[in-house]
Amino acid sequence: MPDHKEEKIRVYRNPAKNEEYFKNRVGMGTSYDVGVRKLTILDKEIQLYYLNGLCDTAYIIHLMRELVAINNRKEDPDELVDIVENRLLNAQVEKVKTLDETTDQVLSGLVAVIVEGAGFAFIIDVRSYPGRNPEEPDTEKVVRGARDGFVENIVVNTALLRRRIRDERLRVKMTKVGERSKTDLSICYIEDIADPDLVEIVEKEIASIDVDGLTMADKTVEEFIVNQSYNPFPLVRYTERPDVAANHVLEGHVIIIVDTSPSVIITPTTLFHHVQHAEEYRQAPSVGTFLRWVRFFGILASTLFLPIWFLFVLQPDLLPDNMKFIGLNKDTHIPIILQIFLADLGIEFLRMAAIHTPTALSTAMGLIAAVLIGQIAIEVGLFSPEVILYVSLAAIGTFTTPSYELSLANKMSRLVLMILVALFHIKGLVIGFTVLIIAMASIKSLQTPYLWPLIPFNGKALWQVLVRTAKPGAKVRPSIVHPKNRLRQPTNS
């Protein structure tokens, strides 16, 4: 968030002025959740400012008991500030001299304790955000592996990452983004691995974000730090799995954690980062390689399968005699291109309906879509059976794509290729696919080539992409992130 140069107001020594400031600044007395508790200790007023719902109420009650107990002892009123400081039994207590920062901290869920005449506020971290416990992400499930996942609490997410990387060189830099929302955001990397230039680029991009609030959390941050424009391909990778995030941090990537989001942003990324899945690394290298190739085939099928089949329908002479069955077995009244688009649109309707349908009704909805709509549409001649079959196969290929954002981009590419094939036949397919590759090769994500290690070519890195190698054999980190320390394992191992 860019610096807005305004004169900071220091904490008043007069309690009445501090209370007036909070009434004017945050609407205390108007907003029901902004609270203040005033205590008289040793003939001086102590104010506790807090936000209902974001603080641990039990601790606030405990704190008030500790402060009131001071009256039961013979203490020097001139030493009240030191006495109060010693009574603040909490792991995180800091002194803040301005009311602006005090207000921001209170709105973040911390408690401010202001002693009359002190001229500063004690800020106590007793945040207790409402939220859920870590659980396995729905979109990144594995047969073997951890069952925890990121949640909407940045403190919990940082702890999940710290639990996996207990390295004293792991850095978690906290900042606030959003002029009004002041959303907490942290940048995570390992100091002696991550490229300092990459860290500087990410920090500068985040510091330059000038927006009212991060209502869409990490997605808003993404649109500011990378020049997405109308490019459908994802330029950063999202993950809800702490083990995946930790693995990328150890490779030299920079992770961005945004409060209120159950996903973290991995930067920088290439196309091949979006086609990897944690399941491949939970199986034997040979099995992991097999799963990876099956996934690659599904991703390619989701993009190219339908355009190629449609080309064979338009030009049956391209097929050898023993493969003529791939085409249409009978003519239909509706153009094939329209059938394909309608079937694809129907699958999108089904996907959107599944998202908004309660779990208890989703099975019934699937049966209605698959049996009633699909079967009846074929029987009445609206669709040919081949169209339903091949559109379904392409849809299954879409679902095998680990990255949801990449699957949508591939679907858009497929529709464009379909139109080009309908207009120009084989020339349209060749030209469209060539333009697609050139466009992807020209993309850069935080100065990282999108098609690396294919373009520019790096044989060793490409082998790591195509084959799931055993961990003892993966001794160096990917060169694309320019790590300060390329060795994954100690030199004496």
Curated annotation (Swiss-Prot):
tRNA processing among keywords: no
Record protein name field: Stage V sporulation protein AF
Keywords: Cell membrane, Membrane, Sporulation, Transmembrane, Transmembrane helix
Transmembrane segments: 296-316, 334-354, 363-383, 387-407, 418-438
Annotated membrane topology: Multi-pass membrane protein
Any single Gene Ontology cellular-component annotation: plasma membrane
Compartment list: Cell membrane
Species this protein is from: Bacillus subtilis (strain 168)
GO BP of this protein: spore germination; sporulation resulting in formation of a cellular spore
Signal peptide (residue range): none
Main localization category: membrane
Family: Belongs to the GerABKA family.
Pfam family, one: GerA
